[in-house]
Structures are given as structure tokens and as C-alpha cells.
């Protein structure tokens, strides 16, 4: 799954996304129904976009759309758990820290929707590959020159 995309699945499916640098992946998961999804966002807010036809490209609208899709599947919002990954500082320009802004917008949007963040692996200066296991809600995080991590 690529940048600006969203996927939703029930157990036992695994959803994988590559090339996570300053982008942020937000997962939402319902343990009771064993349904989850992730959105791979590139920019903080759709309000900054001139053309608003790609909601999954933006952190705020991506979270909103993913939550709506899980609600349509019958999961109540009170059972959602969120995890955040990414938001790395990939560029030298300190004024252009898109990753940090993506993390901030993700946290603010999840707080607005009263969805708890139960785990995160954010920031730093390296890329990540993520796999969501819808059987457990676990996120496998792979990075170059670092051990695999499960959150």
C-alpha cells in the first residue's frame, strides 16, 4: 500500500506499507471485532490543499475517513485503539519538518475524536516499513540497520 492510501480488513489479513519517512501511518483497531485499518498520510491538513480530492493524503482527513469506514463495519468508536508510526525528520531544512507537523496533526485529530493512542514509534531520522496484523492489532516495524519492533 502506498502513500495517500487507506486499507481496512478483518482478521486474518495483514496490511503492509513501505517507504514511511516524514509520512505518518495511523492505525485504528477494534480488538473485539478484530477489524483494523491504516492510512498512510503525507501532509498534515487537507485545509492546506488547493484540490481536496485525495483525503487519505492528509493526516486529519485520512484519520476521519478511516474512522468512518470502521464505523460503517459496525465497530463503535469507543472500542477504537490508535497507533502512530513515522513522522521522521528526513530533510536538513529545520523549517520544513513535515514529519513533526504530521505527528502533531495526528495526535490532535485522534484527541478530537476521543480515540486513545495506545502506542507509537515516531520521529527520529530513519524510514520504516509497517505491517498491521488484523488478528492481533500488532504493528511490525522494520527499519534498516535496526532490529524489528512490534508495537
Swiss-Prot record:
Entry keyword Aminoacyl-tRNA synthetase: no
The protein's name: Probable chemoreceptor glutamine deamidase CheD
Superkingdom to which the source organism belongs: Archaea
Reactions listed under catalytic activity: L-glutaminyl-[protein] + H2O = L-glutamyl-[protein] + NH4(+)
Biological function: Probably deamidates glutamine residues to glutamate on methyl-accepting chemotaxis receptors (MCPs), playing an important role in chemotaxis.
Keywords tagged on the record: Chemotaxis, Hydrolase
InterPro entries referenced in this protein's UniProt entry, alphabetically: CheD-like_sf (IPR038592), Chemorcpt_Glu_NH3ase_CheD (IPR005659), Cytotoxic_necrot_fac-like_cat (IPR011324)
Family: Belongs to the CheD family.
Molecular functions per Gene Ontology: protein-glutamine glutaminase activity
HAMAP family according to UniProt: CheD
Biological-process GO terms, alphabetical: chemotaxis
EC number: 3.5.1.44
Lineage, opening ranks: Archaea, Methanobacteriati, Methanobacteriota, Stenosarchaea group, Methanomicrobia
Species assigned in the record: Methanosarcina barkeri (strain Fusaro / DSM 804)
Amino acid at each position: 500500500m502506498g502513500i495517500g492510501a487507506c486499507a481496512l480488513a478483518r482478521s486474518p489479513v495483514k496490511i503492509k506499507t513501505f517507504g514511511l519517512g516524514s509520512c505518518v501511518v495511523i492505525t485504528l483497531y477494534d480488538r473485539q471485532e478484530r477489524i483494523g485499518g491504516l492510512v498512510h498520510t503525507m501532509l498534515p491538513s487537507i485545509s492546506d490543499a488547493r484540490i481536496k480530492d485525495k483525503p487519505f493524503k492528509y493526516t486529519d482527513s485520512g484519520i476521519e475517513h478511516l474512522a468512518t469506514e470502521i464505523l460503517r463495519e459496525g465497530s463503535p468508536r469507543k472500542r477504537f485503539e490508535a497507533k502512530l508510526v513515522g513522522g521522521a525528520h528526513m530533510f536538513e531544512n529545520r523549517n520544513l519538518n513535515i514529519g513533526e507537523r504530521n505527528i502533531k496533526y495526528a495526535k490532535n485529530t485522534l484527541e478530537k475524536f476521543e480515540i486513545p493512542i495506545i502506542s507509537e514509534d515516531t520521529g527520529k531520522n530513519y524510514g520504516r516499513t509497517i505491517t498491521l496484523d488484523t488478528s492481533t492489532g500488532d504493528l511490525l516495524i522494520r527499519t534498516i540497520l535496526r532490529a524489528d519492533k512490534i508495537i
